[in-house]
Amino acid sequence: MTHTIKKMSLIGLILMIFTSVFGFANSPSAFYLMGYSAIPWYIFSALLFFIPFALMMAEMGSAYRKEEGGIYSWMNNSVGPRYAFIGTFMWFSSYVIWMVSTAAKIWVPFSTFVFGADMTQHWRIAGLEPTQVVGLLAVGWMILVTCVAARGINKIARITAVGGIAVMCLNLVLLLVSVAILLLNGGHFAQEINFTSSPNPGYHSGLAMLSFVVFAIFAYGGIEAVGGLVDKTEKPEKNFAKGIVFAAIVISIGYSLAIFLWGVSTNWQQILSNSAVNLGNITYILMSSLGTTLGNALNLSPEAAMTVGVWFARITGLSMFLAYTGAFFTLSYSPLKAIIQGTPKALWPAPMTTLNANGMPATAMWLQCVLVSLFILLVSFGGDTASAFYNKLTLMANVSMTLPYLFLALAFPFFKARQDLERPFVLFKTKASTLVATGVVVLVVTFANVFTIIQPVIEAGDWDSALWMIGGPIFFSLLAMAIYQNYSSRMSADPEWAAE
């Protein structure tokens, strides 16, 4: 059957990377936190983390293009199975938690599109509280996603393409409207250009700036998720590396350019110093400001300019909903594929590794859907205790999601040392360049994770959060080691069973 399964084009792969990595909301958040002084930190994060890490992924992906297991296969073939399983299991677990939160979050942009504002806190149906209504919608969303995704990679690629196009269109609107405003206003920027100090009084201390560096580094995360799609890509020996390199360059330039353009239409002191502005609504406030400023530049009446602003916010809501949808489809399948199809089949019950007619591990996908749905219902209907439990889960996933970058970067020199691989794409041609790139990425990711853990302690003496963040990777590692040890014991007791 496998020869009938359609593969993804280069454009499809680029759009998938774009929806997985480029969060349109990251540039408004950066402008809100740091103004123009965010740009040097974004460039720093791209040069010292994102671009070298993306190039490592491109080399590994093109060399291991026939492997089904994504990052698990890469680490397994470079270092060893136990190392690979712990890193991949930790990464997969944190994406399950990501799905729990995002399935509920996705309704905010949807509500903004339909009603012109976030009304999710006012949704009451049949005596249910808003949190419970959103929880039920999130479960329905999970079921719909799994139902469509189980029908094949082509369905996922089509949806992520729509998401990727929506994000690109938002960026295009930002670019074209900002240029139009500049021309209409005689080249005048609403925000004074200053790359060294933040207009936000809360971001003047060294500690706050370091926390922003972490924010910038994490904005570039997610490219490893497309690793599981190498074998689903057309001509992967050429297209996979091309797709990653092209997407990495566009994303790196895109973030800094987007931050720069926000200052054309929005003055930080006038619009963003209001206490009602927060990281949850900043994207819609900035897009509304962009529309209103365009209306004013075109000499429309104040009411008409405000209406333009409201419609800009609505269109942003729709585009963000589509972008979330695209990311959700990729991330509901790719991490699961790495952990199920990459690892030895004997690790899992037989139905979990069985592929349907479309080449998808449908049973495993439905089990994941049930697990995520149970978590959502527990958090939505469990009251304060469940809410506290969810906050702790999120803290546990905080570090667990990015620690696998360390596992992957540390596996890279081992991958380069192998002499038996056909390498269609090689960028790091010397041992020195390999070690420098690995060292820089490892140092940057280690700093980001260590700082994330100690920040609550330094700022508020909050040891509880710090311990939960340390506990996450430890818990997921111990669970992975227990699963792997159980497999090893059964394998040594009955080698024939393991080979089945």
Curated annotation (Swiss-Prot):
Ranges of the Periplasmic topological domain: 32-37, 105-124, 185-209, 265-308, 383-394, 455-462
Location of this chain's protein in the cell:
Cell inner membrane
* Matching Gene3D superfamilies: Amino acid/polyamine transporter I
Q: List the disulfide bonds.
A: none
The cross-references to Pfam families, in alphabetical order and at most eight, read: AA_permease_2
Residue ranges crossing the lipid bilayer per the database entry: 11-31, 38-58, 84-104, 125-145, 164-184, 210-230, 244-264, 309-329, 362-382, 395-415, 434-454, 463-483
Q: Topological domain, Cytoplasmic: which ranges?
A: 1-10, 59-83, 146-163, 231-243, 330-361, 416-433, 484-500
Listed under GO cellular component are: plasma membrane
An example GO biological process term is: amino acid transport
InterPro entries, per database record: AA/rel_permease1 (IPR002293), APC_superfamily (IPR050367)
Which Gene Ontology molecular-function terms are recorded?
A: amino acid transmembrane transporter activity
Principal location: membrane
Q: How does it sit in the membrane?
A: Multi-pass membrane protein
Alphabetized, the UniProt keywords read: Cell inner membrane, Cell membrane, Membrane, Transmembrane, Transmembrane helix, Transport
In which domain of life is the source organism classified? Answer: Bacteria
Similarity annotation = Belongs to the amino acid-polyamine-organocation (APC) superfamily.
Instruction: Report the protein name in the record.
Output: Inner membrane transporter YjeM
Gene that codes for this?
yjeM
